[in-house]
Regions:
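Short, intrinsically disordered, charge-biased short linear motifs at domain edges
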Residues: 12-17, 65-72, 78-84, 119-128
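General secretory precursor processing signal
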Residues: 12, 16, 31, 85, ...
Length: 141
């Protein structure tokens, strides 16, 4: 009876460990978003809080050049790619149109969209892009 309990316990532990390691996709939803926007009337940049409706998926990359990729929900193309896999602390670092930091143990992320203010070039309207930062949580799919 004890041997049977030990076996069942061992199998349950192995299944739980495998499930944690096997997650190939995470769905992430922003909870708070802040940044800067341009007030055209005052011709000045201001700090701003934005709607937190950002959703994206982090999944194993389909190309060999990257370990992971992040796509905004509804977009087929990755907006950020992650060259390396998760590190020992469970952190993943991705960059592209936006920068992303994700911890798979905490299931929390930090998203940064750095385009605008400093990067709007010739032909771009002042304030066309609004730099923003979001934090939120992810869940395994």
């Amino acid at each position: 009876m004890n041997a049977m309990r030990s076996t069942v316990c061992l199998l349950a532990c192995l299944a739980a460990t495998t499930a944690v390691q096997a997650a190939d996709t995470y769905l992430c939803v922003a909870e708070m978003t802040t940044g800067f926007n341009y007030d055209a009337n005052k011709k000045a940049w201001r700090s701003a809080d934005f709607r937190s409706d950002k959703k994206f998926a982090i999944s194993r990359s389909k190309t060999k050049a990257y370990a992971w990729e992040a796509k905004e929900v509804g977009d087929a193309r990755p907006a950020a790619t992650c060259e390396k896999d998760f590190n020992e602390a469970g952190n993943l670092f991705c960059s592209g149109v936006f920068d992303l930091r994700f911890n798979r143990r905490q299931l929390r992320f930090l998203y940064a969209y750095p385009i605008g203010y400093w990067s709007d070039g010739t032909g771009a309207r002042e304030g066309e892009n609004t730099p923003a930062m979001a934090i939120g949580r992810c869940r395994e799919l």
